Amino acid sequence: MTEFGIRNMDQVAPVYNGHRGMLKRQLAFDNVQVPTSLYCGLFSAYEEEQAVPTGLDSYPHDSSSCELPLLTPCSKAVMSQALKDTFNGFAKERCRLGIPGNPWLWDENNVLQWLLWAAKEFSLENVNFQKFLMNGHELCSLGKERFLALAPDFVGDILWEHLEEMMKEYQEKAQEPYIDHSNRDSLNQWMNADSLNFTADPLQCGAQVHNYPKNGMYNDMCSVPTGQTLLNPKQEFQQYPSSCLKSRAVNYPPASQDFARSHMNVLLNSLNSGKLRDYDSGDSGTESFESTESLLHSWTSQSSLVDMQRVPSYDSFEEDGNQTLCLNKQPMSFKDYIQDRCEPAELGKPVIPASILAGFTGSGPIQLWQFLLELLTDKSCQSFISWTGDGWEFKLADPDEVARRWGKRKNKPKMNYEKLSRGLRYYYDKNIIHKTSGKRYVYRFVCDLHNLLGYTPDELHAMLGVQPDTDE
């Protein structure tokens, strides 16, 4: 017995010594030809497997067998749906800004608003807005090739697809021109049509946009007859050059085209230089209450006295913005405007609807002061907001309810009184609304509501059955 416990060595399988000559390692050494190159045979045997890949060699040269995913109908549908979802964002913005849904009816302001939305949506930089200084009819008439030549790189096809989709949509619907009383009615609804040399049906609530003169969107601005001068003209927009303001005294329409172009250039220059505020504001601060696009709306709301001169919008006028720009003629009051529209106040409805007031003043989206007037002239709201009986003074009996309704109107469910009060405080410096000292939640309109609305405080109080507030 051996030390390994094997009794009979014959039981151990014989070791085969022939396999050593078949080892790959031995084969490599057998191929050595130069003694100093020990591994040359090994490299020679595996040189094809040891080649360093370039990254391109892993792909077949035959394009038919390419492993990269091709653009299939399914992937095209996904991309198309993604673009449609993006375009739906502009549909919401269009409704908020009062832009006609039919791009053929856009004015120069609407075209610019669309481009601003696109620049923000697609993070475009160095967009030359001056290339698109045209109205909707001119824009849609460009055709794809000319449009792509003007559009920013890489997104021209997407923008044209969006524009073409909007054009096809309204060609299929063949509906009447877009009218949105909740934002901005046509200015010639309430101006004297004869003074601008075009006619409007008095029974028609809104005139069609394409009935305007073709020489620009600014021909509906204030018309000053020959011989009349402006008294103490104050710039209603801080970027107005004083020399341009004086041009209001010339006769229109001959000079209106140059006036519009020069002022639009000022706006476009500010856009291209990055001086304009962010296109779309967040929920914080006074941006929650007033339209940040008032910079653009101010260009379409210069028509006459009742045009936000007395009650300025978010940032369109200076502190004395309640001075008139056209003192040569007696302005139409809101009361007369309602009568001309053949829309008398209905029972159970506000005497001063905010949507109609916004269209009357040309302020664009409904503003906070307009919304408060609507609530104050609605008998059903007297439990949470009402006149005190002392002139234009009013009280928020339930400020949270007022804030909730304002948030519902502006589609901001997180609105509360703290945020709403920021909008009210903004009005302090603009001499629109002041806080009544010593009284909680009591405010007063200090602007010229009498001439704007055509009602005295006593008339409104009598219509609403308001009794003097004896609470301190």
UniProtKB/Swiss-Prot annotation:
Main subcellular location of this protein, as a coarse class: nucleus
Domain of life where this protein originates: Eukaryota
Signal peptide: none
Keyword Transcription in annotation: yes
Pfam families for this protein: Ets, Ets1_N_flank, SAM_PNT
Entry GO terms, CC: nucleus
Annotation: DNA-binding region: 366-446
PANTHER family for this protein: ETS (PTHR11849), PROTEIN C-ETS-2 (PTHR11849:SF188)
Function as written in the Swiss-Prot or TrEMBL entry: Probable transcription factor.
Protein name: Protein c-ets-2-B
